[in-house]
Amino acid sequence: SYKMFVDEVKKGFTTRLSVFATSHKDATLELMNQLEDSGLISYVGLVEMDRNSPDSVKQLNYQEALQNTEKYIVSAMNFKSCQPIITPRFLPSCSDELMNGISLLRQKYDLPSQSHLNENPNEIKMVLELEDGIRNYSEGYIKFDLFGKNHNCIMAHCVYNTDEEIDLLKERNIFVAHCPESNMNLASGIAPISKYLDKGINVGLGSDVAAGSSLSILRAARQAIQVSKMYYRYVDKQARILDSKDAFYMATLGGGKFFGKVGSFEEGYEFDALVIDDSLIPSLRDFTIEERIERLLYIVDEKLIIQKYCKGNLIKN
Protein backbone atom coordinates (compact mmCIF):
# COMPACT_ATOMS: atom_id res chain seq x y z
CA SER A 1 0.00 0.00 0.00
CA TYR A 2 2.90 2.39 0.68
CA LYS A 3 4.28 1.72 -2.81
CA MET A 4 0.86 2.52 -4.27
CA PHE A 5 0.76 5.75 -2.27
CA VAL A 6 4.26 6.86 -3.27
CA ASP A 7 3.71 5.96 -6.94
CA GLU A 8 0.45 7.92 -6.95
CA VAL A 9 2.14 11.01 -5.50
CA LYS A 10 5.06 10.73 -7.93
CA LYS A 11 2.84 10.71 -10.99
CA GLY A 12 0.72 13.61 -9.74
CA PHE A 13 1.18 17.36 -9.38
CA THR A 14 2.80 17.29 -5.92
CA THR A 15 6.52 17.85 -5.38
CA ARG A 16 6.56 18.20 -1.58
CA LEU A 17 4.28 16.77 1.06
CA SER A 18 3.69 16.41 4.78
CA VAL A 19 2.11 13.12 5.80
CA PHE A 20 0.35 11.57 8.77
CA ALA A 21 1.64 7.98 8.64
CA THR A 22 0.52 5.47 11.29
CA SER A 23 1.05 4.98 15.02
CA HIS A 24 3.45 2.10 14.29
CA LYS A 25 7.15 3.03 14.27
CA ASP A 26 8.45 0.43 11.83
CA ALA A 27 5.64 1.02 9.34
CA THR A 28 6.23 4.77 9.49
CA LEU A 29 9.95 4.31 8.86
CA GLU A 30 9.16 2.07 5.89
CA LEU A 31 7.03 4.81 4.36
CA MET A 32 9.87 7.27 4.94
CA ASN A 33 12.29 4.88 3.26
CA GLN A 34 10.10 4.69 0.16
CA LEU A 35 9.58 8.45 0.02
CA GLU A 36 13.32 8.97 0.43
CA ASP A 37 13.87 7.01 -2.78
CA SER A 38 11.12 8.85 -4.67
CA GLY A 39 13.00 12.08 -5.32
CA LEU A 40 10.25 14.07 -3.62
CA ILE A 41 10.82 16.11 -0.45
CA SER A 42 8.62 15.21 2.48
CA TYR A 43 7.86 15.20 6.17
CA VAL A 44 6.35 12.05 7.66
CA GLY A 45 4.84 11.89 11.13
CA LEU A 46 4.51 8.97 13.52
CA VAL A 47 0.94 9.52 14.70
CA GLU A 48 0.68 9.87 18.48
CA MET A 49 -2.33 8.50 20.38
CA ASP A 50 -2.57 6.89 23.80
CA ARG A 51 -6.26 7.48 24.64
CA ASN A 52 -9.70 7.62 23.03
CA SER A 53 -8.54 5.54 20.07
CA PRO A 54 -9.03 1.95 18.85
CA ASP A 55 -6.75 -0.57 20.58
CA SER A 56 -5.28 -1.61 17.22
CA VAL A 57 -3.67 1.79 16.73
CA LYS A 58 -3.39 3.16 20.27
CA GLN A 59 -0.04 3.00 22.08
CA LEU A 60 -0.17 1.01 25.32
CA ASN A 61 0.88 4.01 27.40
CA TYR A 62 2.60 7.35 27.02
CA GLN A 63 5.99 5.95 28.11
CA GLU A 64 5.97 3.41 25.27
CA ALA A 65 4.78 6.07 22.84
CA LEU A 66 7.62 8.42 23.76
CA GLN A 67 10.23 5.68 23.50
CA ASN A 68 9.00 4.74 20.03
CA THR A 69 8.84 8.39 18.98
CA GLU A 70 12.46 9.06 19.89
CA LYS A 71 13.57 5.86 18.15
CA TYR A 72 11.69 6.94 15.03
CA ILE A 73 13.25 10.43 15.15
CA VAL A 74 16.78 9.09 15.55
CA SER A 75 16.31 6.51 12.78
CA ALA A 76 14.81 9.12 10.46
CA MET A 77 17.86 11.36 10.82
CA ASN A 78 19.58 9.06 8.30
CA PHE A 79 17.28 10.30 5.55
CA LYS A 80 18.06 13.41 3.50
CA SER A 81 14.87 14.33 1.67
CA CYS A 82 12.33 12.77 4.06
CA GLN A 83 12.30 14.22 7.57
CA PRO A 84 10.38 13.53 10.80
CA ILE A 85 7.63 15.80 12.07
CA ILE A 86 5.99 15.65 15.50
CA THR A 87 2.41 14.50 14.92
CA PRO A 88 -0.12 14.26 17.74
CA ARG A 89 -3.23 12.93 16.01
CA PHE A 90 -5.25 15.56 17.87
CA LEU A 91 -5.73 16.59 21.49
CA PRO A 92 -8.53 14.11 22.33
CA SER A 93 -6.27 11.15 21.46
CA CYS A 94 -3.21 12.29 23.44
CA SER A 95 -2.81 12.41 27.22
CA ASP A 96 -1.19 15.44 28.84
CA GLU A 97 1.85 13.30 29.65
CA LEU A 98 2.22 12.31 26.00
CA MET A 99 1.79 15.90 24.80
CA ASN A 100 4.40 17.14 27.26
CA GLY A 101 6.79 14.41 26.20
CA ILE A 102 6.53 14.93 22.46
CA SER A 103 6.85 18.68 22.98
CA LEU A 104 10.19 18.10 24.71
CA LEU A 105 11.28 15.80 21.87
CA ARG A 106 10.30 18.46 19.35
CA GLN A 107 12.49 20.97 21.17
CA LYS A 108 15.36 18.52 21.62
CA TYR A 109 15.55 17.70 17.91
CA ASP A 110 14.30 21.07 16.58
CA LEU A 111 11.42 19.61 14.60
CA PRO A 112 8.22 21.02 13.08
CA SER A 113 4.81 19.75 14.18
CA GLN A 114 1.42 19.00 12.64
CA SER A 115 -2.04 18.13 13.93
CA HIS A 116 -5.78 18.86 13.58
CA LEU A 117 -7.63 21.94 14.79
CA ASN A 118 -11.33 22.81 15.05
CA GLU A 119 -12.49 20.25 12.50
CA ASN A 120 -16.00 19.70 13.85
CA PRO A 121 -18.16 20.83 16.81
CA ASN A 122 -18.11 17.49 18.66
CA GLU A 123 -14.31 17.40 18.59
CA ILE A 124 -14.12 20.95 19.97
CA LYS A 125 -16.57 20.09 22.76
CA MET A 126 -14.46 17.04 23.66
CA VAL A 127 -11.26 19.09 23.83
CA LEU A 128 -12.79 21.66 26.16
CA GLU A 129 -14.03 18.87 28.43
CA LEU A 130 -10.66 17.07 28.52
CA GLU A 131 -8.31 20.03 28.97
CA ASP A 132 -8.57 22.19 32.09
CA GLY A 133 -8.04 25.93 31.99
CA ILE A 134 -8.34 26.55 28.25
CA ARG A 135 -10.86 28.80 26.52
CA ASN A 136 -10.50 27.33 23.05
CA TYR A 137 -8.93 24.46 21.10
CA SER A 138 -5.84 26.45 20.08
CA GLU A 139 -4.93 27.13 23.71
CA GLY A 140 -4.78 23.37 24.19
CA TYR A 141 -1.82 23.20 21.82
CA ILE A 142 -0.27 26.40 23.17
CA LYS A 143 -0.38 24.81 26.63
CA PHE A 144 2.10 22.20 25.39
CA ASP A 145 4.15 24.54 23.16
CA LEU A 146 2.93 22.77 20.02
CA PHE A 147 1.32 25.72 18.28
CA GLY A 148 3.99 27.40 16.20
CA LYS A 149 5.65 30.70 17.17
CA ASN A 150 9.05 29.08 17.74
CA HIS A 151 8.69 26.33 15.14
CA ASN A 152 6.89 25.57 11.88
CA CYS A 153 3.46 24.11 12.58
CA ILE A 154 0.68 22.80 10.33
CA MET A 155 -2.89 22.71 11.57
CA ALA A 156 -5.36 20.85 9.37
CA HIS A 157 -8.95 22.01 8.78
CA CYS A 158 -9.46 25.09 11.03
CA VAL A 159 -13.16 25.10 10.18
CA TYR A 160 -14.51 26.64 13.39
CA ASN A 161 -11.76 28.97 14.60
CA THR A 162 -13.03 31.82 16.76
CA ASP A 163 -11.90 35.38 16.00
CA GLU A 164 -9.33 35.07 18.79
CA GLU A 165 -8.03 31.84 17.31
CA ILE A 166 -7.81 33.39 13.86
CA ASP A 167 -5.58 36.09 15.35
CA LEU A 168 -3.46 33.34 16.93
CA LEU A 169 -2.98 31.69 13.52
CA LYS A 170 -1.44 34.92 12.28
CA GLU A 171 0.53 35.78 15.43
CA ARG A 172 2.07 32.32 15.73
CA ASN A 173 2.70 31.87 11.98
CA ILE A 174 0.60 28.71 11.73
CA PHE A 175 0.23 26.95 8.37
CA VAL A 176 -3.41 26.03 7.75
CA ALA A 177 -3.96 22.87 5.69
CA HIS A 178 -7.34 23.42 4.04
CA CYS A 179 -8.96 20.06 3.20
CA PRO A 180 -12.19 20.94 1.38
CA GLU A 181 -13.17 17.46 0.21
CA SER A 182 -12.63 15.93 3.63
CA ASN A 183 -14.75 18.65 5.20
CA MET A 184 -17.54 17.85 2.74
CA ASN A 185 -17.34 14.08 3.05
CA LEU A 186 -17.43 14.18 6.84
CA ALA A 187 -20.01 16.98 6.92
CA SER A 188 -17.59 18.90 9.13
CA GLY A 189 -18.36 22.36 7.81
CA ILE A 190 -16.67 24.95 5.59
CA ALA A 191 -13.55 26.82 6.64
CA PRO A 192 -13.51 30.62 6.14
CA ILE A 193 -10.45 30.47 3.90
CA SER A 194 -10.83 33.84 2.18
CA LYS A 195 -10.81 35.47 5.62
CA TYR A 196 -7.56 33.67 6.45
CA LEU A 197 -5.92 34.68 3.18
CA ASP A 198 -7.04 38.30 3.49
CA LYS A 199 -5.50 38.44 6.97
CA GLY A 200 -2.17 37.15 5.63
CA ILE A 201 -2.42 33.73 7.30
CA ASN A 202 -0.45 30.89 5.71
CA VAL A 203 -2.85 28.57 3.87
CA GLY A 204 -1.99 25.49 1.83
CA LEU A 205 -4.09 22.56 0.66
CA GLY A 206 -4.52 19.03 1.95
CA SER A 207 -5.98 15.88 0.41
CA ASP A 208 -6.66 14.19 3.78
CA VAL A 209 -6.13 10.63 2.56
CA ALA A 210 -8.64 9.04 4.93
CA ALA A 211 -11.60 11.29 4.15
CA GLY A 212 -10.59 12.41 0.68
CA SER A 213 -11.02 10.48 -2.57
CA SER A 214 -7.91 11.77 -4.31
CA LEU A 215 -4.32 12.73 -3.55
CA SER A 216 -4.44 15.54 -6.12
CA ILE A 217 -3.76 18.98 -4.69
CA LEU A 218 -5.06 20.57 -7.89
CA ARG A 219 -8.36 18.80 -7.30
CA ALA A 220 -8.31 20.23 -3.77
CA ALA A 221 -7.66 23.67 -5.28
CA ARG A 222 -10.78 23.41 -7.42
CA GLN A 223 -12.81 22.15 -4.47
CA ALA A 224 -11.59 25.09 -2.37
CA ILE A 225 -13.18 27.45 -4.89
CA GLN A 226 -16.40 25.46 -4.90
CA VAL A 227 -16.85 25.22 -1.14
CA SER A 228 -16.09 28.93 -0.75
CA LYS A 229 -19.19 29.56 -2.85
CA MET A 230 -21.21 27.43 -0.44
CA TYR A 231 -19.68 29.35 2.49
CA TYR A 232 -20.83 32.59 0.88
CA ARG A 233 -24.29 31.19 0.12
CA TYR A 234 -25.07 29.44 3.40
CA VAL A 235 -22.75 30.85 6.09
CA ASP A 236 -21.68 34.45 5.46
CA LYS A 237 -22.96 36.66 2.64
CA GLN A 238 -20.12 39.10 3.39
CA ALA A 239 -17.44 36.47 2.69
CA ARG A 240 -15.28 36.76 -0.40
CA ILE A 241 -15.56 33.84 -2.84
CA LEU A 242 -12.19 32.35 -3.74
CA ASP A 243 -11.03 32.63 -7.34
CA SER A 244 -8.54 30.64 -9.41
CA LYS A 245 -5.68 32.91 -8.33
CA ASP A 246 -6.37 32.15 -4.67
CA ALA A 247 -6.58 28.43 -5.41
CA PHE A 248 -3.38 28.36 -7.45
CA TYR A 249 -1.59 30.34 -4.74
CA MET A 250 -2.61 27.84 -2.05
CA ALA A 251 -1.53 24.93 -4.27
CA THR A 252 1.92 26.45 -4.85
CA LEU A 253 3.40 29.23 -2.73
CA GLY A 254 0.85 28.95 0.08
CA GLY A 255 1.87 25.41 0.94
CA GLY A 256 5.41 25.76 -0.35
CA LYS A 257 6.34 28.31 2.33
CA PHE A 258 6.32 25.52 4.90
CA PHE A 259 9.35 24.02 3.12
CA GLY A 260 11.23 27.30 2.76
CA LYS A 261 11.66 29.24 -0.48
CA VAL A 262 9.41 26.96 -2.51
CA GLY A 263 6.41 27.48 -4.76
CA SER A 264 7.42 30.42 -6.95
CA PHE A 265 9.68 31.12 -9.93
CA GLU A 266 11.53 33.91 -8.12
CA GLU A 267 15.24 34.43 -7.69
CA GLY A 268 16.54 32.45 -4.73
CA TYR A 269 13.70 29.93 -4.74
CA GLU A 270 14.29 26.22 -5.14
CA PHE A 271 13.26 24.88 -8.53
CA ASP A 272 10.10 22.84 -8.11
CA ALA A 273 8.30 22.71 -11.44
CA LEU A 274 5.91 20.82 -13.67
CA VAL A 275 6.17 20.80 -17.45
CA ILE A 276 2.60 20.47 -18.71
CA ASP A 277 1.40 19.91 -22.27
CA ASP A 278 -2.21 21.02 -22.52
CA SER A 279 -2.27 21.05 -26.33
CA LEU A 280 -4.40 17.89 -26.39
CA ILE A 281 -7.26 19.63 -24.57
CA PRO A 282 -9.82 20.70 -27.20
CA SER A 283 -10.00 24.49 -27.56
CA LEU A 284 -12.16 26.74 -29.71
CA ARG A 285 -9.81 29.72 -29.28
CA ASP A 286 -6.44 30.68 -27.87
CA PHE A 287 -6.30 31.00 -24.08
CA THR A 288 -4.19 33.28 -21.91
CA ILE A 289 -1.80 31.68 -19.41
CA GLU A 290 -4.21 32.52 -16.59
CA GLU A 291 -7.09 30.87 -18.46
CA ARG A 292 -4.99 27.77 -19.17
CA ILE A 293 -4.12 27.43 -15.48
CA GLU A 294 -7.77 27.88 -14.51
CA ARG A 295 -8.76 25.22 -17.04
CA LEU A 296 -6.14 22.88 -15.58
CA LEU A 297 -7.66 23.30 -12.10
CA TYR A 298 -10.97 21.98 -13.41
CA ILE A 299 -9.66 19.24 -15.71
CA VAL A 300 -6.94 17.89 -13.36
CA ASP A 301 -5.38 15.31 -15.66
CA GLU A 302 -2.02 13.89 -14.53
CA LYS A 303 -1.43 12.59 -18.07
CA LEU A 304 -0.72 16.19 -19.10
CA ILE A 305 2.48 16.21 -17.01
CA ILE A 306 5.51 15.80 -19.28
CA GLN A 307 8.24 16.40 -16.69
CA LYS A 308 8.38 17.04 -12.97
CA TYR A 309 11.21 18.63 -10.96
CA CYS A 310 11.81 18.84 -7.23
CA LYS A 311 14.65 21.04 -5.98
CA GLY A 312 16.07 21.07 -9.49
CA ASN A 313 16.08 17.30 -9.86
CA LEU A 314 14.02 15.47 -12.47
CA ILE A 315 11.55 13.05 -10.88
CA LYS A 316 11.62 9.75 -12.72
CA ASN A 317 8.30 7.92 -12.77
Which residues does each PLM region occupy?
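Divalent metal-coordination and catalytic microenvironments
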Residues: 13, 35, 86, 116, ...
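Metal-coordinating catalytic core of metallo-dependent amide/deamination hydrolases
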Residues: 28-159
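His/Asp/Glu-enriched, well-ordered alpha-helical/loop segment
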Residues: 143-149, 193-282
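C-terminal cap of metal-dependent C-N hydrolases
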Residues: 270-317
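Short, surface-exposed connector motifs at secondary-structure boundaries
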Residues: 8-17, 80-85, 144-152, 173-177, ...
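A conserved active-site cap/scaffold subdomain adjacent to cofactor or substrate pockets
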Residues: 161-164, 170-201, 205-207
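Short, acidic/turn-prone active-site loops that include or flank metal/cofactor-
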Residues: 47-50, 119, 180-185, 209-211
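Divalent metal-binding segments
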Residues: 1-27, 88, 92-98
